UniProtKB/Swiss-Prot annotation:
GO terms for cellular component: cytoplasm. It is an enzyme of class 1 (oxidoreductase). Belongs to the mer family. It comes from the Archaea. Gene3D superfamilies: Luciferase-like domain. GO terms for biological process: methanogenesis, from carbon dioxide; one-carbon metabolic process. This is 5,10-methylenetetrahydromethanopterin reductase. It is found in: Cytoplasm. PANTHER family: 5,10-METHYLENETETRAHYDROMETHANOPTERIN REDUCTASE (PTHR43244:SF1), PTHR43244. It comes from Methanocaldococcus jannaschii (strain ATCC 43067 / DSM 2661 / JAL-1 / JCM 10045 / NBRC 100440).
Length: 331
């Protein structure tokens, strides 16, 4: 089992660098930084992190092919790989409609756009001059003047829906799945496998990552309470098929959605129940978290990404995961 950590760059980058260096020193192998226009710029954050770390692999988790052209993303990743001494990874997904609506960007054919963009990015990173006439992506003789250190920078696809998961199985080096519960991987992994088999690939070639809401503390109740706000947002944004899979009370979810819309956060958080917490987070003492992670490993998960909130105290949680969780999952 590999272990990664995810950060939203919503606080000073110096602080982010401190946390990632701490994670590196505590055995984390991957660092994923989210890419949203309203937070600190993902590539500026990754540049600073690269210059303050030595071993940890790092990349956007995840960017998308709409806000930047594939050539701009390829250039950024090649530069990050050079700067980090060959540690770059690329996490790229379809993005979300709400963000694109706010930015006035049309969300066209997400599966096709992502597939074509990855193909173009890989060609550019390989040093090719690219002329490409896809259904969505068009490139006319573009080439990079910078080359990555790695022969092939690993490409991880952010995927949730059936078509996206199948496509990831066909083309991606890894899949980043926003999920914390074995039931979600029971549904997702057969779809990845189907895509892999269609492309003549083995599942051994694909790193299946659980992009999990994690909250770790010596005090299980404190860990649980810290997960509540994140779980509220996950529940509010989950499609009916996911809510039904976990037997979640739809009335409570509707109450959470309405409360979040009106900015009444205490009311939203009050409606988060244990069923939601079990479905959408990995929380508890290090021992609790180890047991939950083992169940994900049994389903075929090969990387656990500790995502927000990580714990009631980030520094303490990173150290606890490094000392108690990672070693137990490496046995």
């Amino acid at each position: 089992m590999k272990f990664g950590i995810e950060f939203v760059p919503n606080e000073p980058i110096q602080k982010l660098c401190y946390y990632v260096k701490l994670a590196e020193d505590n055995g984390f192998e991957y660092c994923w930084i989210t890419d949203h226009y309203n937070n600190r710029n993902v590539y500026m954050a990754l540049t600073a992190i690269a210059m303050n770390t030595n071993k940890i692999k790092l990349g956007p988790g995840v960017t998308n092919p709409y806000v930047r052209s594939p050539a701009i993303t390829a250039s950024a990743i090649a530069t990050l790989d050079e700067l980090s001494g060959g540690r770059a990874v690329l996490g790229i997904g379809p993005g979300d409609k709400a963000t694109f609506d706010a930015l006035g960007i049309e969300w066209v054919k997400p599966v096709t756009t992502l597939k074509e963009s990855i193909e173009v990015i890989r060609k550019l990173l390989a040093g090719e001059r690219v002329s490409y006439e896809g259904k969505v992506v068009k490139i006319a003789g573009a080439a990079l003047a910078v080359k990555p250190i790695q022969k092939a920078v690993p490409v991880y696809m952010g995927a949730q829906g059936p078509k996206m998961l199948e496509t990831a199985g066909m083309i991606a080096d890894g899949v980043l799945i926003n999920a914390s519960n074995p039931k979600d991987f029971e549904a997702a992994i057969p779809l990845i496998k189907k895509g892999a088999e269609a492309a003549g690939r083995s599942m051994d070639e694909i790193d299946v990552a659980a992009y999990a809401c994690m909250s770790v503390d010596k005090n299980a109740d404190k860990a649980k309470q810290a997960a509540v706000p994140v779980v509220a947002f996950i529940a509010a944004g989950s499609p009916p098929v996911v809510l039904e899979r976990h037997g979640i009370d739809m009335e409570k979810v509707e109450a959470i959605r309405n409360a979040l819309k009106s900015g009444n956060f205490p009311e939203a958080f009050k409606n988060v129940d244990d069923t939601m917490l079990e479905a959408f987070s990995i929380y508890g003492t290090p021992e609790d978290v180890v047991e939950k992670c083992k169940k994900l490993a049994e389903m075929g998960v090969t990387q656990i990404v500790a995502g927000s909130p990580i714990g009631p105290n980030k520094e303490t949680a990173i150290k606890l995961i490094g000392k108690k969780v990672i070693p137990a999952l490496k046995e």
